[in-house]
Amino acid sequence: VSPMAIQGPKSDDVVASVFGDWVRELKYFWFRESSIEGIPVVVARSGWSKQGGYEIYLLDGSQGTRLWEIFREAGKPWDIGPGNPNLTERIESGLLSWGGDTDEKTNPFEVRMGKYMDLDLSDEVIGIEALQKIHAEGPRRHQLGLIMEEEEPMRPGFVWNDIMFEGNKIGDLTNNVWSRRLEKNI
């Protein structure tokens, strides 16, 4: 599967111009199979932008260039074009990156995703009893955002550094970036 993201305040208009207005009704993290000019895709309401957006999952990798051209043309009426992920916006918004902000030991309740869990599933679902127990007892860890005292911009990125207090490890720093808006490391 080859993903392409259409993000930002004009994404609804651009994606609707390609697929139709039904995309505006997609709830966040929902998806629908569709096609454009015979190219099979999955359209998902998701992405790395606090401004909202879509991810288009190409099911036939040989059609990547054609799909790119379709959306490049679709963006012209709104004067938009190719961009890149914005790490600062993602971190300021609290959007998670699997493997960057989480690992195989992270559970949904630690990262504010518990509300998306259906805990009323059968006992045959792998891990459901463990998740029910964590929900009942509460998670041992919580992910949260920090504003750091460091005056100079730190090197951004995925870091997984220990957070120490009085000689004891109290947490992990999983990501950091200089926020121009806050003029602080977050």
Protein language model features and the residues they cover:
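Conserved, structured C-terminal
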Residues: 1-186
